[in-house]
Swiss-Prot record:
Pfam families xrefs: CofC
Domain of life, per lineage: Archaea
Entry function: Guanylyltransferase that catalyzes the activation of (2S)-2-phospholactate (2-PL) as (2S)-lactyl-2-diphospho-5'-guanosine, via the condensation of 2-PL with GTP. It is involved in the biosynthesis of coenzyme F420, a hydride carrier cofactor.
Name under which the protein is recorded: 2-phospho-L-lactate guanylyltransferase
GTP-binding as UniProt keyword: yes
Subunit composition and interactions: Homodimer.
Catalysed conversion reaction: (2S)-2-phospholactate + GTP + H(+) = (2S)-lactyl-2-diphospho-5'-guanosine + diphosphate
């Protein structure tokens, strides 16, 4: 199985701008990537990072500056083996959660995101393709079934939690056990409660 981790190296995580400046967002994105790669290492797979530009990393890196759909679909079309895609901003991903993803049966195994996205998948069907726009989990269910494939979904809080918005940083601080949580604390990002909900602030 080929395991791919897409990584936006150019201007990552712009929606975190209320909390982190551009340099900090780039640094934090790299830290989350490191956490995901560490978890994959523990599972025993050798991932390739699919980056939008060249990055200095002690891992195999493929540079593809096309939009995500085109880049991933190119890999799927060219592969003669199952392909797994795990997003680089899954700062809460653990080896156990990833092992469940990889071990699940089905032509297409999907890990839905909390906002309707698709945070990870395993494609064993040769005709499966991605469409990451809008509520992509619905599209990916349909695409898999239209191709004649069976679909399995992984119910995992840790795989469903991607980091896009400032509120997502609270989840990292509350539940993270890796470098991303440590990085946020070192940057002075703190938990706070506003309107009865836990969020973050940076005094």
């Amino acid at each position: 199985m080929r395991v791919v981790v897409p990584f936006s190296a150019t201007e990552p995580k712009t929606r975190l701008a209320p909390v982190l400046d551009a340099d900090e967002r780039r640094a934090f994105a790299r830290v989350m990537l490191a956490d995901v790669l560490d978890a994959l290492d523990t599972v025993g797979v050798d991932p390739t990072v699919l980056a939008t530009e060249a990055i200095d990393l002690d891992r195999p890196v493929t540079v593809d500056d096309r939009p995500l759909d085109a880049a991933i679909n190119g890999l799927l079309a060219a592969s003669d083996e199952p392909v797994a895609v795990v997003m680089a901003d899954l700062a809460l991903a653990t080896p156990d959660a990833l092992d469940r993803l990889f071990a699940a049966e089905g032509d297409v195994v999907l890990a839905p995101g909390r906002g309707g996205g698709t945070n990870a998948f395993v494609a064993r069907h040769p005709d499966f393709r991605v469409d990451y726009h809008d509520a992509s989990i619905r599209d990916h269910r349909r695409i898999a079934r239209d191709a004649g494939g069976t679909v399995t979904e992984i119910d995992s809080y840790r795989l469903s939690t991607d980091v896009d918005e400032p509120a997502d940083l609270a989840e990292v601080l509350l539940h993270g056990e890796g470098r991303a949580a440590d990085w946020l604390r070192g940057a002075g990002v703190q938990l706070t409660v506003a309107d009865g909900r836990t969020t973050v602030e940076r005094p």
